[in-house]
Amino acid sequence: MIDNKINEDEFQEPFVFKTDWKNAFNDEEFVKVFSSDILENYIINKRWYGGKASTLKYIEVVDFFKISSKDNTYFGVLLEVNFKEAFYQHYFMPLAFMSEEELDTNTIIAPVKMNNVDGFLVDALHQEDFRKLLFEEIIHSKGTSSKVQFHKGNKLEDKEYISSKFMGVEQSNTSIIYNNTLVLKIFRRIYISMNPDYEISRFLTERMNFKSSPEYKGSISVILTEGNITLGLMQELVPNQGDAWKFMLEEVDRIFENLNHKKIKINKLPDIDLFKRLKINEVPHEIIDWAGLSIFLRIQTLATRTAEMHIALGSDIHETAFTPTTYNGDYTVWLKNRLTYQFQNRLNILENNLHKLDGLALELANQFLDHKKEIRKLFLDFDWTKMKSERIRIHGDYHLGQVLVNGDDFYILDFEGEPESTIRDRKVKQPPLKDVAGMFRSFHYSIYATIFNNKDKYPYDQKELFQAGEILFKYFVGVFLQTYTEVAQGGNLNIGYKKEIDFLLKYCLLEKAVYELGYELNSRPRWSVIPLTGIASIMEFEKHN
């Protein structure tokens, strides 16, 4: 039993049911009370619940499965959350019924009495017995034909269960560390389709033997007539020193501190064009003196791993989900519809939030509104008949936060795709340069976040820091791009020639920056200067090329 007393003040009385726990989800009365009176109050406060911006209408139990250990019966419940705004989302919730003595947690869903037995409904992942059961089911999976299927990856050795614990802060999924060597990610938000994270992770490990992402070890799925739902993904726990976002913030902070330490004159720093490719020995010595050599070597390594990921994702000719494909009319219609809708949405948000902006952000916002016709035209100018490169499955949500630092190397993770996109859209084959553009936007963010978060630390005005930041950004892009194109083309990945590469990068960067603009305007308007600067520099590039 845990030390903390359970907080029963939230509940006046336990919910009383005639049914026993083992038959609970076959009992209409239990299901009705559970999905309304019990669950609604609980779910809206969970970190993984994605409907906070909408109004919950009702929750429905759409399916369930039973799974038992030696001592306990657990239910895996599939929920459909319906919203007043006329859409729905699906969630997975594993449930346990425990007496107070058996509880491993003080986070309870509700006190209940089942067939005269007192106890508590809890999220089963809080119970060690359940976590151990999942581990053993994956290790000993026999590929049975039951509704819930456990798969043991061919790289998973038989192991004894030793320990399990939650991994860090709970986000949109819940991750459990086993034996300090494995991670099981439980997907809370689920889709009636294979999760791309599972699909790509297994493909990269078992088909391509790709070494720069965590090894696929196993999975949990539910097999329904409508399709297979991925509930869990087990991977190796990669030794690391944190993510590349944290690493880059520290590096950029050091670089900005050097401005003062080394008495660097910002207006004398050599500038270059956006997308100008550079080998490290072509980076001017003034830039190396300011930023240091090591950051460019690390960017080279990241570019190499990114290209190797794309080569692995785009070199299978047998598995149709991963075969490279050309551009066509259908893809173009899909792309333009998606982008014109998104662009219009961002325009509306900007017009409604203009009063929150000032200074450079306001100036750039007005410039954006003045150029809306040209930007829309740029999105509509996508001519697939001129494209000679190929589309492949990509990471889809690629940024510094999706990369782990391990010594001098990097691991790439989280292949779930862009959170705002539908599951079908996440599986559409896209230009690999879309991932590259995502990383470039992340570089841009790391530079501006450093300026915003340390504004009193560097003895320069913001305008000068922005100027230095833009120069630094272009050198990061140039070194990354040189290495990426060399490695990608050397691995027979068809990304096109220079003109096409520049066009696709410009297109994807614009798409990313417009996407970010909506987020920033809604949550932190001061930061909207970051995507607005990105949009302005692409429009500038467009004017001169």
List each language-model region with its residue ranges.
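Conserved ATP-binding subdomain of kinase catalytic cores across diverse folds
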Residues: 64-68, 73-351, 400-402, 406-491, ...
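Terminal low-complexity segments of carbohydrate-biosynthetic enzymes
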Residues: 1-25, 522, 531-545
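ATP/Mg2+ or Mg2+-diphosphate-binding catalytic cores
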Residues: 470-493, 503-545
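An alpha-helical support segment within catalytic cores of ATP-dependent transferases
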Residues: 154-162, 346-392
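Conserved catalytic-loop position in the HRD/HxD motif
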Residues: 397
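Short Lys/Arg-enriched alpha/beta "domain-start" segment
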Residues: 11-56
